[in-house]
Curated annotation (Swiss-Prot):
Keywords: Ribonucleoprotein, Ribosomal protein. Gene3D superfamilies: Glucose-6-phosphate isomerase like protein, domain 1 (3.40.50.10490), Helix hairpin bin (1.10.287.610). This is Small ribosomal subunit protein uS2. The keyword rRNA-binding does not apply. Signal peptide: none annotated.
Length: 277
């Protein structure tokens, strides 16, 4: 399978700062294979190997699409979350960009129950707005925002993905562990402080640089889009616009919450959790 969409050069990677690893005292010896040299107290990543590893991984990404499987992008640290979200939406794939909740892969029943709760709250806010007190509406709106923030990118994911694309596997170690437990391959952007052992497709690079992350994730995204176009697969965003009221109207004017408000929110949340099951 020839790679048409890896037009990156070593110069592109260098311009994005992809070659800068961590300080030499913060390295993982298992990354030695991908290190070019030590300079000014930093390890410099071998960008020729970065390019080679990326090119080797692309046919596997396209094979996932050809097999009618999905890709789950995971990147919750601040440098990655916007890039991950944008790329997944453009490619029509799923994503986690805020917080990995334990069991997102290994206990999908619990996650689906949370999604049912989210659906229920949206319906209640849309249909029963006139019957809710301002306080009840505010509590529901807050609960809605919490759930949506964490579940937005996997809300319509019906089964386990065929591939995880991860930025910084040491930061996303729970996601990687769950994927390995289920036999799901992992492609990861891996810095010099990470253990590459559990990763199926190691892309050695600076995983703390926004430019570096964006450059490599965009290549992955473009290959997914290209594979879908060739197969005539429609690209459908994992995030759908929903007919819900403007939730800002329900937001509390105070940033600090009392213990009583927290208790009331929990009670209301339990009520809807129970009705959604």
């Amino acid at each position: 399978m020839e790679s048409q969409s890896c037009k990156l050069t070593i110069k592109d990677l260098m311009s994005a700062g992809a070659h800068f690893g961590h300080q030499t005292r913060r390295w993982n010896p298992k990354m030695k294979l991908y290190i070019f040299e030590e300079k000014n107290g930093l390890y410099i990543i071998n960008l020729a190997k970065t390019l080679q590893q990326l090119r080797n991984a692309l046919p596997h990404i396209r094979k996932v699409i050809q097999d009618n499987k999905t890709v789950l992008f995971v990147g919750t640290k601040k440098q990655a979350k916007c890039v991950i979200r944008e790329a997944a939406i453009e490619a029509g794939e799923f994503f986690i960009a805020e917080r990995w909740l334990g069991g997102m892969l290994t206990n999908m029943t619990t996650i689906r129950n949370s999604i049912k709760t989210l659906d229920k709250i949206e319906k209640d806010l849309s249909r029963n707005q006139a019957y809710l007190t301002k306080k009840e509406a505010a509590l529901l709106a807050k609960r809605h925002q919490k759930l949506l923030r964490n579940l937005e990118g996997i809300r319509y994911m019906k089964k386990a993905p065929g591939l995880l694309v991860v930025v910084d596997p040491s930061y996303e170690k729970i996601a990687v562990a769950e994927a390995k437990k289920l036999g799901i391959p992992v492609l990861a952007l891996v810095d010099t402080n990470c253990d590459p052992t559990p990763i199926d497709h190691v892309i050695p690079c600076n995983d703390d640089s926004l430019k570096s992350i964006r450059l490599i994730i965009n290549v992955i995204k473009e290959n997914i889009i290209e594979a879908k176009h060739k197969l005539g697969i429609e690209i459908v965003s994992p995030v759908k616009s929903l007919e819900v009221p403007d939730l800002s109207a329900f937001e509390s004017s105070q940033d600090d919450e009392s213990d009583e408000e927290n208790r009331e929110e929990d009670l209301l949340a339990k009520k809807f959790d129970g009705e959604a099951n």
